[in-house]
Amino acid sequence: TVCGHRRDLSAVDAQAVLALCRGNQVKWELRLSYNLLVRGEGEDLVIVQLSPPPGPVAVTPGQPAAFGEWTVTLGAEPGEGDSYPVSLPEKASLTVTSWKSADRMTLPDSRGPRSLKRLCADAGFRPWQRDALPVLRVDGIPAAVPGVGADAAFAPQPGGPAVFVTFTKEDGNEQ
């Protein structure tokens, strides 16, 4: 049971833990899905529930918004980090949240919408990394995710208004 709900770890997670348990390392640490951290020290195995991702955070153009280890900004110029040009409707509700299983995005030049889970996997994110990613939402719809891209529905039109959404990871480490 994770966070009061029955959850199944993936076979990949289980295989990774078993491989580390059977290995020669005396101390090791592995992050898994559902904000779980597994630590091995000698013959001891400890599973820790990490803090969940933060709840929704409102985003205002020109003001940085903190989301876990990430800072999300909307500005006139691209910033340091992953920046994507987007066209935002006036008076839209702008928030940053974690991903949801129903999220779908259509990336530019793609053949149609795909699940955010699949897009994150294709971008090389492990499940625990995906769980910590900020998702910029426009009126609740996923618009941009660092390392994945911006939804084609929010692509600026030539000569039209645009802002840049920039995602910066605080610790400076790659995902």
Stretches with model-predicted labels:
Residues 1-175:
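AMP-forming adenylation/ATP pyrophosphatase catalytic core
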